[in-house]
Amino acid sequence: FVWSNQLGISTSSGADGSFELELPAASSPNGGGIADGDYIIYFFISNYELSTVEVTFASGEILNDNRIIKIDGELRKKVNLRRMVQINTSVQPSIFPKNFEEDVKVIIKATPDRSDIFFYLKGLEIPRQPTVYSGLLIKDISSGELVLSFNPDTAGTIKRVIDKPYREFDINFEIINDSLGSIIPPGTYEALPYIIIESNDNVPAHILNALESGYNEFSEEYFKYPIYRTGGKFTITE
C-alpha cells in the first residue's frame, strides 16, 4: 500500500512491486495542485516494517534528486522493506476431487524475524481443549472473488504471540455439504486465513484510515489488507 498523507493520494503496487501515484494536474494549491515543499510517501505491508521516501515539489513539479527521484517522478532506487514475519500457507492435500469427503487441512506457518509479533486470528477457545482455529476465506484465482468463507458464528477473535523459531496454526474445513454435494466447483483456488498483524511498531493512524473500508473485517473486503504471504493454492478436479 503506497500512501502520501500530505497529498491525500494512494495506490497499491503490482505483483512485481511497481506502482504509479497519480498527482493533481493543477499547479496551484487552490486548484487542487501541489504546494511547494517536502512530501513523504509511505510504503506499508502489515508484516514488514514501514518504509518512507521524501520528495520535494516546486512550482507543481518534482525536483530532481540524484539520490532519490528523477524529474519525471521515477524513483532512482528500489524501496526496500524489512520483513517482520514470514507467513506461508499450505493446503493438504493440494489437489483433490470435487467429491472429496475428508477434511482439508490448511496450515499457517509464521516465522518471525522479531520477538514482538502478534497475530489476531479467528477461532473457538474451549476450556481445557485445544483452540479450534477458523477464519478461512477461499478465493477463486481466475476471478479474484470470494467463493467460500469458513468461520462458525460462535468464533471470536484470538490474539496469539508468534514465538521464535516459528509457530503453526491449523484450520480444517470440508468441501462437501450435508447433501454430499461439492460446495466449490472444480478450479484453482487460494486459501487465505484471516490474520491481522500487530507489533511494537506504531503504524500511523492516517495510514490505517486510508486503507479500504472493512479491510480488517472477516469478509471479501479483507482481500484489501496489505499482507505478503506465500503458498495457499490448491486445485479441485472433476
Predicted regions and their residues:
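Hydrophobic beta-strand segments
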Residues: F1-S4
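Short, acidic Ser/Thr/Gly-rich low-complexity loop/linker segments typical of extracellular
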Residues: G8-P24
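Short strand-edge motifs at loop-to-beta-strand transitions and within beta-strands
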Residues: F19-L21, K77, R167-F173
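Short Pro-Gly-centered beta-turn/loop motif in secreted/extracellular proteins
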Residues: E20-I40, S179-P186
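A short, solvent-exposed loop/turn motif at the edges and junctions
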Residues: G32-N64, K70
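Extracellular and select intracellular beta-sandwich modules with Ser/Thr-enriched
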Residues: S51-V53, L75, P226-G232
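Extracellular beta-sheet/turn segments enriched in Thr/Pro/Gly and aliphatic residues
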Residues: F57-S94, K233-E238
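Ser/Thr/Gly/Pro-rich, low-complexity flexible regions
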Residues: S90-E238
